[in-house]
Amino acid sequence: MKDQWLDRWDNRYSAEAFAYGELPNNYLKEQLEKLEAGTILFPAEGEGRNAVFAATLGWQASAYDISSEGRNKALKLAEKNNVTINYQVGELDTLGYSPQSFDAVALIYAHFPAAIKSAIHKGLDKYLRNGGIVIFEAFSKKHLEYIARDENVGGPKDIDSLFSIDEVKSDFANYDFLELEEKEIDLNEGIYHNGKGSVIRFVARKR
């Protein structure tokens, strides 16, 4: 399963075109522009569009993914934008981040395998300082209805890899939600996110 998961993303990111475009996610952009720049971590960052954008705002951006192909694309994008990002390849518990070393964590379409997604969310908590911010956007469980109508919108087809409001409240139980909603949005992100979809979005502060 792990090898299949890695192969899937390496194959997607090895193409010349950026799978989800070179521009940042709209929700992330909107939220980061409200915050004072600091240190930020991007799990499952893929080709780096969001970390690179954060770096252009003055954030010290760290990122990780299991895909070395994703990292290669991300570093090229950073160079194109005249910024640097700290991008590692591996899984969270192997990367050596220091506890409470980040001011923010951005989870943007970070759809981990269903069996481990909650554990990863809870594992990320120790790296975020008290009072730090999580910015989250990912597909909701209702999104399967949108995929059935138009596969171009992308996203996991396994309902257990998708999210509900109750699920994120449970995973982030020691956070105060500054905003939290399930919403239909129009996606226009590169090759694989196009059309109407259903997402969970939130901004939350660690207690």
Regions of interest found by a model, annotated:
Residues 67-69:
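Conserved SAM/SAH-binding beta-strand->alpha-helix loop
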Residues 159-182:
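Short alpha-helix
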Residues 131-139:
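Conserved beta-strand signature within the Rossmann-like core of class I S-adenosyl-L-methionine
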Residues 93-104:
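A short acidic, Gly/Pro-enriched loop at the edge of an enzyme's catalytic core
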Residues 81-93:
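Conserved SAM-binding strand-loop segment of SAM-dependent methyltransferases
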Residues 103-118:
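A short SAM/SAH-binding and catalytic strip from SAM-dependent methyltransferases
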Residues 1-35:
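Conserved class I S-adenosyl-L-methionine
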